Amino acid sequence: MLVLSRKIGQSIIIGNDIEIKILKIDGGEIKIGIEAPKDVKVLRKELYEELLKENKEAVKFDIKNLPGFFKKK
């Protein structure tokens, strides 16, 4: 993991087209701005983890239900 120190107004560039800028520091909270191409998803980690959890739940399948799945109605 790369660890950097930044001050308000300073930025970090990732690749050629992603910029992370420090906008405000207030106590223990830091406000950042992220400029990235529209095709790059930018999510808070807790939201990303929740989406992964929901996706895993959505694909759970109980094999015991398989025989009835193909019955003609």
From Swiss-Prot:
InterPro entries: CsrA, CsrA_sf. The keyword ATP-binding does not apply. SUPFAM superfamilies: CsrA-like. Gene3D superfamilies: Translational regulator CsrA. One of its GO terms (cellular component) is cytosol. GO terms for molecular function: mRNA 5'-UTR binding. One of its GO terms (biological process) is mRNA catabolic process. It comes from the Bacteria. It is found in: Cytoplasm. Keywords: Bacterial flagellum biogenesis, Cytoplasm, Repressor, RNA-binding, Translation regulation. Pfam families: CsrA. Belongs to the CsrA/RsmA family. A translational regulator that binds mRNA to regulate translation initiation and/or mRNA stability. Usually binds in the 5'-UTR at or near the Shine-Dalgarno sequence preventing ribosome-binding, thus repressing translation. Its main target seems to be the major flagellin gene, while its function is anatagonized by FliW. Homodimer; the beta-strands of each monomer intercalate to form a hydrophobic core, while the alpha-helices form wings that extend away from the core. This is Translational regulator CsrA. It comes from Thermosipho africanus (strain TCF52B). The gene is csrA.
